[in-house]
């Protein structure tokens, strides 16, 4: 009797796996405990966002961006607003820019807190998520006090932001900053020199810089491999060029370096937030939070009570929407997960002709086979945790 040739064992990872971070399904080919092939299956959260946007006005298209990376919603709104403003050829007032940057950095904290703590949970540490979610709750309240919503804020608007921030909110965000740095130190105390955490992350999924560029990585995935590439410094938008902050980079490009980069990025985000809060209190930080052009931004309720023209402009804006000059533009922002880009094509009507969304997580997940091949089965969850993927933007 001829002995059958040994063949690899195929298993499903997800889509209901707690370490899958959403509806991820991986088909893993195993040789014993060693992973020989990884086949990601996506599309379980596909909602046709890009097509839906083509049938909406520019204002109606905005809430779809909250639902992409739903961990840090305002960062995605930012890209769409900047793209539309570029086509309209408008600049927004200084106060509006500062508020946008402040809330983008709050979004970065929200995203990194979730990622770092759940990455720890994926390798067996249960305390960090409890501490991290306590801080996220405070940040969610800041979202709620600005926009009325904890998650899907719809706060950034074309031309600025929806409404000004109350001064008490600015004080409370300031009071949050320094104690939060202590929480970062506590989290590092739990994880950075933790023997088990290091054994599970050091040397796992090392990415050389050339490979990172080749796979289309961005954000922490390239900074962890040693490139100081951050769109806030490389291609500054809004008022980032006036702010002082550093770009942390890794040395080895492994899971552990990516964790360290995210921890330091949270500290830099707090630095940026404090600078924004200081500038918002200065005389040059006062003024409107959105452009005064009522063809783009609706007039205030007070104006509508006084002026028939304001009433008409408000009605036209919410029924018909504003018309955007024909053209095409690509705008990218440094979202917490990497370079989030919006390629927007306008045909001169009140609806986008095409809106292509460049999701950073999509490029990172596509390299899952490259990153995981040759590692152990137990390393798969550690690698997914260090990629920081979210399915809202991968499946769109």
Curated annotation (Swiss-Prot):
One of its GO terms (cellular component) is plasma membrane. One of its GO terms (molecular function) is quinone binding. Signal peptide: none annotated. It is found in: Cell inner membrane. Keywords: Cell inner membrane, Cell membrane, Membrane, NAD, Quinone, Translocase, Transport, Ubiquinone. NCBIfam families: NuoD, PRK06075.1. NDH-1 shuttles electrons from NADH, via FMN and iron-sulfur (Fe-S) centers, to quinones in the respiratory chain. The immediate electron acceptor for the enzyme in this species is believed to be ubiquinone. Couples the redox reaction to proton translocation (for every two electrons transferred, four hydrogen ions are translocated across the cytoplasmic membrane), and thus conserves the redox energy in a proton gradient. Belongs to the complex I 49 kDa subunit family. This is NADH-quinone oxidoreductase subunit D 1. It comes from Nitrobacter hamburgensis (strain DSM 10229 / NCIMB 13809 / X14). The gene is nuoD1.
């Amino acid at each position: 009797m001829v002995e059958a040739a040994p063949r690899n064992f195929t298993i499903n990872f997800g889509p209901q796996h707690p370490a899958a971070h959403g509806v991820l399904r991986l088909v893993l080919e195993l040789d014993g405990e060693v992973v020989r092939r990884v086949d990601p299956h996506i599309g379980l959260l596909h909602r046709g966002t890009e097509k839906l946007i083509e049938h909406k006005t520019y204002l109606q298209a905005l809430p779809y961006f909250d639902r992409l990376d739903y961990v840090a919603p305002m960062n995605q709104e930012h890209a769409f607003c900047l793209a539309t403003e570029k086509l309209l050829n408008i600049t927004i007032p200084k106060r509006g820019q500062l508020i946008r940057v402040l809330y983008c950095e709050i979004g970065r904290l929200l995203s990194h807190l979730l990622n770092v703590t759940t990455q720890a949970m994926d390798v067996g540490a249960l305390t960090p998520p409890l501490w991290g979610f306590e801080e996220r709750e405070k940040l969610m309240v800041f979202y709620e006090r600005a926009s009325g919503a904890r998650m899907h804020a719809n706060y950034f608007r074309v031309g600025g932001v929806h409404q000004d921030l109350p001064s008490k909110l600015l004080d409370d965000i300031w009071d949050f900053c320094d104690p939060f740095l202590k929480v970062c130190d506590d989290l590092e105390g739990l994880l950075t020199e933790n023997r088990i955490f290091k054994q599970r992350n050091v040397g796992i999924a090392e990415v050389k810089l050339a490979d990172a560029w080749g796979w289309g990585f961005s954000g922490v995935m390239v900074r962890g491999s040693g490139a100081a590439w951050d769109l806030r410094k490389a291609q500054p938008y809004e008022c980032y060029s006036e702010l002082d902050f550093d770009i942390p980079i890794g040395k080895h490009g492994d899971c552990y370096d990516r964790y360290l980069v995210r921890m330091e990025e949270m500290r830099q985000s707090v630095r940026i937030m404090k600078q924004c809060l200081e500038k918002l209190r200065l005389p040059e930080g006062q003024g409107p939070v959105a452009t005064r052009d009522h063809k783009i931004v609706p007039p205030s309720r007070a104006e509508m009570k006084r002026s028939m023209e304001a009433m008409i402009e408000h009605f036209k804006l919410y029924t018909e929407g504003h018309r955007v000059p024909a053209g095409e533009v690509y705008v990218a922002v440094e979202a917490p997960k990497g370079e989030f880009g919006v390629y927007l094509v306008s045909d001169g009507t009140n609806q986008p002709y095409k809106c292509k969304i460049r999701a950073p997580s999509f490029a990172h997940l596509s390299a899952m086979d490259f990153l995981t091949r040759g590692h152990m089965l137990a390393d798969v969850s550690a690698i997914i945790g260090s990629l920081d993927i979210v399915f809202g933007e991968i499946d769109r």
